[in-house]
């Protein structure tokens, strides 16, 4: 047994005791959801935060997630390597970014345990660093054609096609490539548009503007609450706006700890995003959230959360706290809400206009949250009701194992909802029953 595994087991035992002690402190708080959530008071967990994460099992033959009433689900593509994000091309081809978080050098005993836990959950390991193309040639909802579209990338995540240029969000920046309609691959050399600092929250989501003149990129923080100081966080925890004509870039909005999925609300033209909030303050404190994004807006990280609730663990800046914007809609504590796409009314039978959200699932609370795909209804450009499940059943009944973990969500050319599952290594396809 290696020293790292010994250390991990020691911390796991201590963490298990701490987890049981926290459970004895009282009933679990109610989920913090919606436009006016009840966010429990912070209970800082110090050097040993709650650590609970199911082991990755994957799906058995014939097994699949549970679709909401009126819906059905099938596997569109299988046998991938940690599929994270989805891009659908105009001809219906489906591109899948296959990548993973890469382990850094552990700095503390807790980091040893955290890395061991994440490996067990398949959330840490080798990164395939490729984009794979799938094509459903006969229209039966299952891809028959599989091609390596791009390889040798650097933890690719976000993708976007604007005209004849294909953009990839590598962890260290956005790269542009020439694209030919219907091509099975891109082998040309790319052109880097902007560089980002890698590590930490490593995903780089992309979303073009409706007119194709701008490209938006999500760049998460390096750390949980800027433990290494704000200098190393410069240029992070933000959404960038790239001008595709001039090549210039700027921070469009900041204070967003880890903004991942982005989508346009088509009736208002407003940008929305889902954000993963900080750890170590309790099961529901603070909640992850869905929010509209204002040009020049600041959303609190690291100084405060859910508006202007100060995080006492962080050296404060009163001026920044004073201008922090309260998010629009809470998505529950530590649900790891990553995927986001607009779903027009009628796309899924019985579902009105709204947003589909892929919730990757928690690792740092006493009871698990997330591990599902949910839907938030919209009316007049804003969230208008409680969430509804689209897909569930990603966890074993005892919650010790996960069959899958949803990440990216998007609409296929046939109106189906496609869901990337990076534990099951599947792309799921949701349609009316």
Regions found by a protein language model. Give the residues of each.
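Beta-propeller domain segments
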Residues: 24-68, 105-107, 111-122, 126-128, ...
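Surface loop/turn motifs at the tips and blade-to-blade linkers of beta-strand repeat domains
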Residues: 77-80, 147-153, 193-198, 251-255, ...
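Hydrophobic core register within WD40 beta-propeller blades
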Residues: 86, 159, 206, 259-262, ...
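Residue-level detector of Asp-centered blade-edge/turn motifs that repeat once per structural unit
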Residues: 89-92, 161-163, 208-212, 265-268, ...
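Short loop/turn segments immediately following the C-termini of beta-strands
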Residues: 91, 99-101, 171-173, 179, ...
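Conserved beta-propeller blade signature
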Residues: 93-95, 165-168, 214-218, 270-274, ...
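Blade-level signature of beta-propeller repeat domains, shared across WD40, Kelch, NHL, RCC1
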Residues: 410-433
């Amino acid at each position: 047994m290696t020293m790292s595994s010994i250390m991990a087991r020691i911390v796991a035992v201590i963490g298990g005791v701490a987890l049981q002690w926290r459970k004895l402190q009282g009933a679990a708080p109610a989920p913090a959801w919606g436009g006016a959530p009840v966010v429990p008071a912070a209970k800082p967990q110090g050097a040993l935060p709650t650590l609970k994460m199911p082991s990755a099992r994957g799906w058995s033959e014939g097994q699949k997630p549970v679709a909401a009433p009126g819906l059905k689900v099938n596997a569109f593509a299988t046998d991938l390597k940690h599929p994270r994000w989805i891009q659908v091309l105009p001809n219906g081809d489906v591109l899948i970014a296959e990548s993973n978080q890469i382990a850094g050098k552990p700095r503390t005993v807790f980091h040893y345990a955290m890395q061991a836990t994440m490996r067990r959950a398949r959330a840490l390991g080798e990164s395939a660093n490729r984009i794979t193309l799938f094509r459903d040639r006969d229209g039966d909802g299952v891809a028959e054609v599989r091609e390596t579209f791009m390889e040798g990338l650097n933890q690719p995540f976000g993708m976007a096609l604007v005209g004849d240029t294909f953009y990839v969000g590598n962890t260290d920046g956005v790269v542009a490539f020439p694209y030919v309609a219907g091509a099975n691959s891109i082998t040309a050399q790319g052109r880097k548009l902007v560089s980002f600092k890698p590590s930490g929250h490593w995903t780089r989501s992309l979303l073009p503007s409706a007119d194709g003149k701008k490209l938006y990129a999500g760049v998460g923080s390096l750390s949980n609450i800027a433990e290494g100081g704000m200098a190393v966080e410069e240029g992070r925890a933000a959404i960038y706006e790239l001008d595709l004509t001039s090549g210039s870039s700027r921070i469009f909005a900041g204070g967003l700890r880890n903004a991942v999925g982005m989508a346009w609300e088509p009736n208002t033209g407003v940008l929305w995003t889902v954000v993963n909030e900080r750890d170590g303050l309790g099961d529901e404190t603070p909640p992850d959230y869905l929010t509209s994004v204002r040009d020049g807006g600041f959303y609190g990280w690291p100084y405060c959360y859910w508006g202007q609730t100060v995080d006492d663990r962080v050296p404060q800046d009163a001026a920044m706290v004073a201008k922090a914007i309260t998010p629009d809609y809470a998505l529950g504590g530590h649900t790891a809400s990553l995927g986001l796409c607009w779903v027009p009314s009628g796309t899924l039978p019985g579902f009105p206009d709204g947003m589909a959200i892929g919730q990757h699932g928690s690792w740092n609370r006493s009871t698990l949250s997330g591990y599902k795909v949910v839907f938030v209804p919209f009316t007049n450009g804003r969230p208008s009701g409680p969430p509804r499940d689209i897909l569930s059943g990603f966890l074993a009944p005892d919650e010790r194992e996960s069959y899958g973990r949803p990440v990216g969500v998007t609409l296929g050319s046939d109106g189906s909802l496609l869901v990337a599952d990076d534990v099951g290594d599947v792309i799921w396809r949701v349609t009316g029953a």
